[in-house]
Amino acid sequence: MKTSSIKLGKNIKRIREQKKMSQGDICRALGFDRAQMSNIEAGKGNPTLATIEKIAQALGVASDELLK
């Protein structure tokens, strides 16, 4: 696992939880399955920039907030 993928996943999970969203909520909004989102949040996935942008939009934040 790359450190950047782990950091991205932690940021997504933190922001999602702050917004009181479940993984199911965000998956439905994005059309993802839970396994895909779980892997991203665990730092096991390597999402494309387009995927990161979709996640950011669903969370109502700028993409760079997820990449910090």
Residues covered by each model-derived region:
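A detector for short, charged/polar N-terminal pre-domain segments
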Residues: 1-7
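Short basic helix-loop element that most often maps to the first helix and adjoining turn
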Residues: 10-29
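Conserved hydrophobic/aromatic packing and binding residues within compact polymer-binding modules
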Residues: 12, 26-27, 37-40, 66
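Residues within helix-turn-helix
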Residues: 24, 35, 53
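Recognition helix of helix-turn-helix/homeodomain-like DNA-binding domains
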Residues: 31-46
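DNA major-groove recognition helix of helix-turn-helix/homeodomain DNA-binding modules
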Residues: 48-65
